[in-house]
Amino acid sequence: ELIMATYKEIKGVTIQTLDSDPVVGGVAGASWSSGGNLNTAKSASGASGANNSAALVFGGQPGNKTDTEQYNGSSWTELNNLNTGRDYLGGQGTSTAAIAFGGGTQSETWDGTNWTEGNDLNTNRDTLGSGTLAYTEGFAVGGWKNPGVASEVESYDGTSWTEVAEMNTARNGPFLSGDNTNAICSGGSTEPPVVANAELWNGSSWTETSEINTARYNGGSAGTYTGALIFGSNPPASGVTEAWNGSAWTEVADLTTARGYQDGAGAANTNAIYAGGYTNTAVANTEEWTAAPVTA
């Protein structure tokens, strides 16, 4: 008699049993896998990138870093530094065309080779939510403006930042997916408490929508307003990952290394990257998220 080993016996992990196809949160066959380590362990950095084979990480801690590293799908290469060292900043765009903002009021644009100083944010803040798509449609949401939690929202048009309608809930360290025309903002801290509520942006106003399953903040995000991915948090360090399908949040495979205080990148909830972050110290490891999109 031939006895087949189960997936659990082979992999030694707990898996979720589903009644039909293994599809959760609008993604199928989803998992995190290890990628190449950053050259320098860091947290509180900004990040940008279209997918897990082309990304950029810049700034961060310890110290107000100026470091910039670019990922090619297997390894990180150090490139030209930011003009202004800072931490707890956000980033948006790709590995060759991006914007870094926050961790103060400064913003800088990246052309694939160099950083150029651009127009400042209107509100000085850090640990803000940053968009995940093209840098010319930048979006800066919430954060910490010392003193107090920020509800301010700013939209970038490729040249300057403009204040737009504030969120219903002021929040520090929120998750943001999308751009300045359509986005979803979730989680964050109201100092206290940590919240689970989420809001949708339609280009002019915010509307409350379904809450995330686990209230948390200071993690990474990827995707769009109809297909988002949020992952990690700190404190406490968490690997929880949730996918948004346009109407509900579903918990999917956790990060291998629980961590937070780091920006994530990825233009879709099927392909994302999380590099660096903070557990009880800054880390250098990279994790790549890959999932199959669900089609009708």
Task: Give the predicted meaning of each segment.
Residues 1-296:
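Polar, enzyme-active/binding microenvironments
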